[in-house]
């Protein structure tokens, strides 16, 4: 696995994780070899190489799930029908060295200790100073680990096909932690699109798997995160940060409750209140655009809000949710939906005189010519970004 040739490294990983019998125990020496080599395997610059590593990680956890379940069943005297998960052994200083000195080796404890180590290793790979390859590989491997079923809180429908079979984990480990969730929130604003997408997927699985009290506690921190992310988006106007904020809103909409919000709840407590918040934000931003285009270009980008609405409306159950709502809520949904369609027309009325001028570089209105901080490129960028996201939102509205 440390050979200079990538084909040999991949062959080494394959031979380490593959077996004709999925319940066959992985030896402690192989697990130690994986620990020594996973760091450089995850950071390979070849995307195809990393894709192969993802496939082998899937095979590794399929085998760990089956082998540990078989070992636990042989050690346990409880009935086979008992479904309560056993706790993972808590790591202690010197555990690894003590395992290597035991005779005979405790294969179950070695395998469970490796799973615990691997999750902590993936968390470390998400650090801000890590390379792009480390971050994206760790995120995709975390998805594999979560979908393997080792966290008992992950819904059955979200598990991989192999994890939905007969051989289930005998032990359970809660993967979502404050440290991991904080790292994932930071990665939602990552410059790379695939990192942002994977971070949202991992975070959503982690939040769904958390016990209800823990989930509520974590969700209570989201308004502060959204406010911080929106402030950065407004300050820079960068498309990647706007997309990160939009993805965060889409995830919050998925996790929000279906019912009407209580007076004490935040604006993100229910799907309707969150959608209403986005519509109000869009309306206020467009009002600024109507009144002072230079101010809007300089610090009130509209494309982030349209992108957030696109991620919300693009969810498969969005219109089914509206159709099944009580009459009073249905009326509010319908009104908000119509207001957003009107806002798309409003954006066009604000920028068409810039984009439709008979000039290749666009037309700068007279009132903006004296703005030293603005040029034609910035005005065109503001206009086209907003219209691009508004177009995607319109396509989602019309498609359904």
Region spans (language model):
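Alpha-solenoid helical repeat scaffolds
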Residues: 1-33, 37-285, 308, 316, ...
């Amino acid at each position: 696995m440390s050979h200079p040739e990538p084909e040999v490294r991949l062959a080494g990983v394959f031979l380490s994780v593959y077996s004709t019998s999925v319940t066959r125990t992985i030896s402690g020496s192989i697990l130690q070899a994986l620990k020594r080599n996973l760091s450089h395997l995850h950071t390979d610059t070849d995307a195809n190489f990393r894709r192969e590593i993802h496939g082998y990680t899937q095979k590794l956890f399929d085998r760990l799930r089956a082998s540990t379940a078989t070992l636990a069943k042989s050690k346990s005297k409880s009935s086979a029908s008992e479904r309560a998960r056993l706790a993972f052994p808590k790591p202690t200083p010197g555990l690894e060295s003590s395992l290597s000195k035991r005779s005979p080796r405790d294969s179950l404890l070695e395998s469970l200790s490796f799973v615990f180590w691997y999750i902590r290793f993936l968390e470390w790979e998400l650090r801000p100073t890590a390379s792009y390859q480390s971050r994206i590989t760790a995120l995709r491997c975390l998805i594999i680990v979560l979908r393997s079923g080792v966290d008992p809180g992950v819904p059955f429908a979200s598990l991989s096909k192999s994890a939905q079979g007969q051989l289930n984990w005998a032990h359970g480990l809660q993967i979502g932690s404050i440290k991991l969730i904080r790292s994932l929130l930071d990665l939602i604003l990552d410059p790379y699109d695939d990192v942002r997408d994977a971070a949202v997927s991992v975070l959503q699985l982690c939040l769904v798997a958390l016990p209800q009290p823990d989930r509520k506690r974590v969700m209570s921190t989201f308004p502060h995160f959204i406010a911080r992310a929106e402030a950065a988006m407004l300050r820079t106007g960068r498309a990647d940060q706007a997309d990160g904020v939009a993805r965060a809103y889409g995830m919050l909409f998925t996790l929000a409750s279906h019912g009407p919000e209580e007076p004490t709840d935040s604006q993100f407590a229910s799907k309707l209140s969150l959608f209403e918040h986005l519509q109000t934000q869009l309306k206020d931003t467009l009002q600024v655009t109507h009144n002072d285009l230079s101010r809007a270009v300089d610090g009130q980008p509209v494309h982030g809000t349209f992108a957030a609405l696109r991620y919300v409306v693009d969810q498969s159950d969005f219109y089914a949710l509206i159709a099944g709502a009580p009459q009073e809520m249905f009326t509010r949904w319908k009104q908000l939906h119509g207001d957003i369609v009107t806002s798309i027309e409003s954006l066009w009325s604000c920028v068409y005189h810039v984009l439709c001028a008979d000039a290749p570089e666009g037309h700068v209105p007279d009132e903006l010519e004296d703005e030293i901080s603005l040029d034609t490129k910035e005005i065109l960028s503001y206009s086209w970004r907003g219209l691009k996201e508004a177009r995607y939102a319109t396509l989602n509205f019309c498609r359904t």
